[in-house]
Amino acid sequence: MPLIPPPNPQKTYQIAVLALGLVLLLAFVLISDHSPKVGDHLHNLPFGGEYKDGTKTIKYFQRPNQHSLSKTLAKSHNTTIFLIILGLIGTLHGLHYFSNNRRISSSLHCVLCQNKH
């Protein structure tokens, strides 16, 4: 069966542009810094902290054990990704095992013409 292009490729382009837009939006949300900004134009404390000089004192909330918290979140993030991948593999294996056409999909026969290639 020869591959032929779709009669109207505009839908393909619309889907590609929509997917690219969603990826860019997701990247912007995940990468950009949305933390509150504290301080003035000379003394900026975006992640909390304390600044003192002769005439000015700025104290802003600093998370306790920020570095150990970020390490814990990174470890749990890696574990979550591993469990999602393992779950997807298990789901695909289960779908293959319990599918109605298991005889055809597990053999080396072509699904379309039932011949060996």
Swiss-Prot record:
<keyword id="KW-0916">Viral movement protein</keyword>
<keyword id="KW-0472">Membrane</keyword>
<keyword id="KW-0813">Transport</keyword>
<comment type="similarity">
    <text>Belongs to the Tymovirales TGBp2 protein family.</text>
</comment>
<keyword id="KW-1133">Transmembrane helix</keyword>
<comment type="function">
    <text>Plays a role in viral cell-to-cell propagation, by facilitating genome transport to neighboring plant cells through plasmosdesmata,.</text>
</comment>
<feature type="topological domain" description="Cytoplasmic">
    <location>
        <begin position="100"/>
        <end position="117"/>
    </location>
</feature>
<feature type="transmembrane region" description="Helical">
    <location>
        <begin position="12"/>
        <end position="32"/>
    </location>
</feature>
<dbReference type="InterPro" id="IPR001896">
    <property type="entry name" value="Plant_vir_prot"/>
</dbReference>
<dbReference type="Pfam" id="PF01307">
    <property type="entry name" value="Plant_vir_prot"/>
</dbReference>
<dbReference type="GO" id="GO:0046740">
    <property type="term" value="P:transport of virus in host, cell to cell"/>
</dbReference>
<keyword id="KW-1043">Host membrane</keyword>
<protein>
    <recommendedName>
        <fullName>Movement protein TGB2</fullName>
    </recommendedName>
</protein>
<dbReference type="GO" id="GO:0016020">
    <property type="term" value="C:membrane"/>
</dbReference>
<feature type="topological domain" description="Lumenal">
    <location>
        <begin position="33"/>
        <end position="78"/>
    </location>
</feature>
<keyword id="KW-1038">Host endoplasmic reticulum</keyword>
<keyword id="KW-0812">Transmembrane</keyword>
<feature type="transmembrane region" description="Helical">
    <location>
        <begin position="79"/>
        <end position="99"/>
    </location>
</feature>
<dbReference type="GO" id="GO:0044167">
    <property type="term" value="C:host cell endoplasmic reticulum membrane"/>
</dbReference>
<feature type="topological domain" description="Cytoplasmic">
    <location>
        <begin position="1"/>
        <end position="11"/>
    </location>
</feature>
